[in-house]
Amino acid sequence: MKFNTKALALACAIVWGLAMLVTGLANLIWPSYGQHFLQTMSSVYPGYHATRSLAEVVVGTLYGALDGLIGGAVFAWLYNQFC
């Protein structure tokens, strides 16, 4: 059985983008929520800073979606190559 590469890439993009969005929005409401996670992501994604602003939440969401898209596509491609 092979993975549909586009479907898995899109699913991973949605999940990781939503994870970044929800964590960022929760951090705007409750300042200590997810702070360590967001600081870790700011060290991974260039141009993203873990400051409490809506613009940074949008940037983090876009980075998360792009990261999930690429990661999901690479995972599905590798899986299909070896199975």
Please identify what each model-predicted range represents:
Residues 1-83:
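Juxtamembrane/disordered regions of integral membrane proteins
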